Each structure stands twice: as C-alpha cells, then as structure tokens.
C-alpha cells in the first residue's frame, strides 16, 4: 500500500478522523475518511461457576441500553493486556489472576482503524468498581445459556460480546 496523502480533519481524546488517499497493492486508488483509534481491550470475565460478567450501559449511537462484555480503549503507550486489567477493575471492581488472549479483530475495517483484543479473565476476586464520571454501569453475572438466549432473542446485540462468547466456546472453556 502506498499512502499518497493523509489530512487530519478532526481530533478528540478518543479518536481522530483523517481523509486519506492511497494506492493498494494491486494498483487500485482509494480515497476514504478513516477513523483512527488506539484500540480497545475487551474482557470476558468468567467466575468459578462458569458465569460470564456483563455490563449494561446506555449507548448513545444505539439509542439504547446494551448488555455487553466490559471493554475500554487503550491509553497512549498501553498494551491491550494492561488496558484489560485496568478496565476490568474500573468498570466492574474485579481483578483476575489468569489472563488469556482469545482473539484480536477489526470491528469495522471499512473506515475504522481500531483493533479490539478480547481476553479471558479467570481466578477472579471482586472489589469496588470505579467507573469514569461519564459512565453509569450496571453489572450482572450471566450463564452461558442466558447469553445464548439473549443473542437469539436480540436482547444481546453487541458484536464484541458475540465474538468473545463464540471464541470462548471454541477455545476458552
């Protein structure tokens, strides 16, 4: 890929947007607005009873409360695992002894340069959550059957939660 030009159009503390012009390896010219993001860590926390911890919060773009795996963005210079440990403690109050990477993926590669990494977190101890000032988070433990019913019924619609749950069923149990 050959980048011809990149012009930053917008920037805040979460992401930036640039207009880019490039030529792909086959010679095809591409012009696109790209959302740049440091990446996110997603935590699939499983307790000794094989229940999975989900958080519920209002998601403005979806105009709805969503049940989802806890997650958060990587701070500058932070690894996905460091972010996962920090975010799990902040959002849920939980700490994990054991961490295993389940998968890394691009949630929307057509225009967003964000990578998400999902970690399995086990050996949990519970504490007090310390969410950010702009976060209102409810937590609840779900059985695998409850999550499957939630996905099938359309009550769980978050993509990272579905991907994490499916990957856990494949390799994490």
Model-derived features: positions:
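A short, amphipathic edge element
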Residues: 1-7
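Acidic, metal-coordinating catalytic segment for phosphate/diphosphate chemistry
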Residues: 8-42, 48-49
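Short beta-strand micro-motifs in enzyme catalytic cores
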Residues: 16-20, 65, 115-117, 138
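Unchanged
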Residues: 39-42, 47, 73-159
């Amino acid at each position: 890929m050959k980048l011809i030009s990149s012009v930053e159009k917008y920037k805040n503390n979460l992401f930036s947007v640039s207009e880019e012009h490039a030529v792909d390896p086959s010679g095809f010219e591409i012009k696109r607005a790209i959302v740049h993001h440091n990446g996110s860590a997603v935590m699939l926390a499983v307790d000794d009873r094989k229940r999975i911890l989900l958080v519920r919060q209002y998601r403005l773009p979806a105009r709805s409360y969503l049940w989802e795996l806890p997650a958060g963005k990587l701070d500058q210079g932070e690894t996905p695992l460091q972010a996962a440990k920090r975010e799990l403690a902040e959002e849920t109050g939980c700490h994990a002894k054991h961490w295993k990477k389940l998968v890394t993926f691009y949630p929307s590669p057509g225009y967003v340069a964000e990578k998400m990494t999902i970690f399995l977190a086990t050996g949990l101890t519970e504490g007090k959550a310390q969410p950010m000032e702009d976060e209102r988070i409810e937590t609840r433990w779900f059985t695998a059957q409850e999550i499957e019913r939630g996905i099938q019924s359309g009550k769980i619609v978050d993509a990272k939660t579905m991907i994490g749950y499916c990957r856990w069923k494949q390799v994490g149990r």
